[in-house]
Amino acid sequence: MLANGAIVFLAAALGVSGHYTWPRVNDGADWQQVRKADNWQDNGYVGDVTSPQIRCFQATPSPAPSVLNTTAGSTVTYWANPDVYHPGPVQFYMARVPDGEDINSWNGDGAVWFKVYEDHPTFGAQLTWPSTGKSSFAVPIPPCIKSGYYLLRAEQIGLHVAQSVGGAQFYISCAQLSVTGGGSTEPPNKVAFPGAYSATDPGILINIYYPVPTSYQNPGPAVFSC
């Protein structure tokens, strides 16, 4: 068992060595169908859940060079570079571009986001997430959602120093999609970024080391399913 001081030291050491980005989808080039995140050079993170960067990790919204064409009911592979290093959940959200608006200028503002994927930890001597060490994630595109243009938001929350307010680290980016073959369902319970999370949410403010938690609540709404 590690003393609290040793835990903090270990977590801090890990915090400077394992940062990453979400730069591409499917077999595209880096930042081709993904909006270039502000951490594209330094692999940094967002620490303030009230910051506009919590949406797509862009202080000034700007589009990706192109759009990924996909179909409702398929999966999109979202890539982390080099891989997910820190313990914590991976989650994916989607937001549909309103009819009549341009995906290249729409920034995803307002309560427009619905969750399509989340992973969960295994409990035991320590919390372990299936995402740790992975670089690719198959994101399901719900078969019943409307056709149209969407932003697909990738998020991993590093919880290695999350025992104090503001300690959780958010690694984020947004891909641009064109979805065809969809249905007519409008997902309920949409959320806004910022707005979906509080710094004191139990899945964000948490000591994952000691005492080892026996439960974990993913931040945000439930995963939408058709």
UniProtKB/Swiss-Prot annotation:
Residues 1-18 form the signal peptide. The keyword Secreted applies. Keywords: Carbohydrate metabolism, Cellulose degradation, Copper, Disulfide bond, Glycoprotein, Metal-binding, Monooxygenase, Oxidoreductase, Polysaccharide degradation, Secreted, Signal. It catalyses: [(1->4)-beta-D-glucosyl]n+m + reduced acceptor + O2 = 4-dehydro-beta-D-glucosyl-[(1->4)-beta-D-glucosyl]n-1 + [(1->4)-beta-D-glucosyl]m + acceptor + H2O. It holds the Pfam family AA9. Cu(2+) binds at residues 19, 86, 171. Its cofactor is Cu(2+). Lytic polysaccharide monooxygenase (LPMO) that depolymerizes crystalline and amorphous polysaccharides via the oxidation of scissile alpha- or beta-(1-4)-glycosidic bonds, yielding C1 and C4 oxidation products. Catalysis by LPMOs requires the reduction of the active-site copper from Cu(II) to Cu(I) by a reducing agent and H(2)O(2) or O(2) as a cosubstrate. Shows endoglucanase activity on tamarind xyloglucan, as well as on beechwood xylan when combined with phosphoric acid swollen cellulose (PASC). One of its GO terms (cellular component) is extracellular region. Lignocellulose is the most abundant polymeric composite on Earth and is a recalcitrant but promising renewable substrate for industrial biotechnology applications. Together with cellobiose dehydrogenases (CDHs) an enzymatic system capable of oxidative cellulose cleavage is formed, which increases the efficiency of cellulases and put LPMOs at focus of biofuel research. Disulfide bonds join 56-174, 144-226. PANTHER family: ENDOGLUCANASE II, PUTATIVE (AFU_ORTHOLOGUE AFUA_1G12560)-RELATED. It is found in: Secreted. Belongs to the polysaccharide monooxygenase AA9 family. Glycans are attached at residue 69. GO terms for molecular function: metal ion binding; monooxygenase activity. This is AA9 family lytic polysaccharide monooxygenase E.
